[in-house]
């Protein structure tokens, strides 16, 4: 455990690693478990900041290579977030990647002095985000909970002298279906090396983000929630591009 920067906390981490080379085969595996908790020492009258931040997860990586020419990697994360209701807290996020070092092939020998590297690679993966934010970019904790203002002063119609009375008011509407924002990304790349002096990397990618946490535009007035519009995993964005 430790403190600093306004927080105190504790963490636990353990890992198991395996590595072996036999002949032209290289095999590596890694599994990591982590658990973390931190508490804000200065909650600033925010009832949510009084509560500890907790996260838990298991991650793994497996790599295989043959003769430094054919490469494969598989990763996964199984992560738990306190931000979501029981049954929706854990997400599984895998990815896979492969590469072919063409310049390592015997038929490349004749031009290796000019083109010393040609590597083709591709990857596809799913990632998740549990740090949700509202329209003002404030971090939202426990979006599945409805919050109530117990001391809202409101004018009461037909009351003596039309005075304000203290009552209850819904501040935020909880969404029990709130869960991880997800992103899938496909990447295809090429690495080219010339004369052992010049290197060129080219990547083409496509990314789809789904379940983006955002506010609904409107609700029926019959719900009695005028001015309080709930959030949900509603948004989608697609990005395409290239990097050199």
Regions found by a protein language model. Name each.
Residues 1-244:
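Extracellular/periplasmic, surface-exposed regions of secreted and cell-surface proteins
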């Amino acid at each position: 455990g430790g403190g600093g920067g306004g927080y105190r906390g504790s963490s636990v981490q353990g890992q198991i690693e395996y590595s072996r080379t036999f002949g032209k085969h290289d095999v590596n595996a890694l599994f990591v478990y982590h658990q973390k908790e931190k508490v804000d020492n200065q909650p600033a009258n925010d009832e949510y900041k009084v509560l500890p931040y907790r996260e838990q997860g298991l991650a793994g990586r497996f790599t295989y290579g043959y003769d430094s020419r054919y490469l494969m990697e598989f990763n996964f994360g199984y992560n738990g977030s306190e931000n979501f209701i029981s049954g929706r807290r854990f997400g599984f996020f895998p990815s896979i990647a492969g590469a072919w070092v063409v310049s390592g092939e015997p038929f490349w020998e004749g031009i290796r002095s000019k083109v010393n590297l040609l590597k083709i690679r591709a990857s596809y993966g799913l990632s998740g985000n549990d740090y949700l934010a509202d329209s003002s970019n404030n971090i939202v904790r426990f979006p599945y909970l409805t919050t109530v203002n117990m001391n809202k002063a409101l004018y009461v119609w037909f009351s003596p002298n039309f005075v304000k009375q203290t009552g209850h008011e819904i501040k935020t509407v909880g969404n029990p279906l709130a869960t991880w924002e997800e992103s899938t990304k496909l990447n295809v790349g090429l690495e080219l090396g010339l004369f052992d002096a010049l290197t060129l990397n080219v990547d083409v990618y496509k990314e789809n983000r789904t379940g983006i946490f955002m506010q609904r535009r409107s609700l029926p007035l019959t719900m009695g929630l005028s001015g309080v519009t709930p959030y949900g995993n509603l948004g989608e964005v697609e990005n395409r591009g290239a990097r050199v």
